[in-house]
């Protein structure tokens, strides 16, 4: 019987944590430390027209005509490796939307910081600035996306940045890789932070962490990376279904009869299928649904859903996607209907994505009684990506 040694599966863990990137190994002169670096560059052309009245940072041009914008959607630099043959680490610096609407003051930020220990193969104990699990799309890979924009617009987490927050979690495959669990405790909402004021009724008055996580059943294949692709483009098939939840005491936004704030609760269920077909073809289907509850009448209380479908013939893939959140207030809702074309030059490492979008953001959706619909914002986007 051949045993997997700790150093060997630690090295494998670092490779998988890279989410398929062409990581560049950097010699360190010792086996106690390993270092791999990679980068992701996304240049976007964005044509915008229609929608609500123009502003300095969004919508059509000030004249009301078509606005043309060229900017870096993402420019990131990552480092990952192992330490002392028992730990692994991952750190990512990213600048988002650099130069959009002529703004070159965008700060680079810590996007991910993960410190991990691997007690046995395919099981991780992690802490740091973590992607918060709720559904599979909630922990997706931004550079291996199927659609141009991710699910963040309808993930109404408390006090996060790009779905990330400080926390401690476990992440692993169990029972012959049939089940995946991912969850733990996270910082969540805090009085005086994340938009909350330090006044009564206090947000999270007891200072308790948020509980969150998801569980998945792997029907075909399995995934071990830290983030998950929208479409794999690797010649393998993956099918899974999952459920997820969040809870934090007195961290909602509706005041209850006893003068305290309501609890924050989120529920999710999702299905993912990526089928590799003969002749270098691939079909992908993503469906997920959400319930966010910040208390009765709160703007972030409501139901949401997201879906994507695509079919790849060799290097070309047409795709459709939608994002929908219907706030209980009926005036803080979100809707995006979109479709486009992906051109894979070197899988996800070099690709071009084109997409047409119709979006209602923080507004009123169609067919809402006693409410006037917010006009659609129209956009045509082209994005060039290089990852190595």
Please provide the spans of the model-predicted regions.
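Outer-membrane beta-barrel "beta-signal"
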Residues: 210-219, 374-388
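N-terminal signal peptide c-region/cleavage motif recognized by signal peptidases
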Residues: 18-20
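Detector for outer-membrane/organellar transmembrane beta-barrel domains
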Residues: 30, 206-208, 216-328, 335-338, ...
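Predominantly the C-terminal beta-signal and adjacent terminal strand-loop region
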Residues: 348-382
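Outer membrane beta-barrel
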Residues: 24-191, 205-223, 301-337, 357, ...
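Acidic/Ser/Thr-rich, low-complexity mid-to-C-terminal regulatory regions of eukaryotic proteins
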Residues: 184-186, 196-200
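Flexible, solvent-exposed loop segments that connect beta-strands
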Residues: 52-64, 196-198, 253-260, 297, ...
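Bacterial N-terminal signal peptides that target proteins for export
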Residues: 1-10
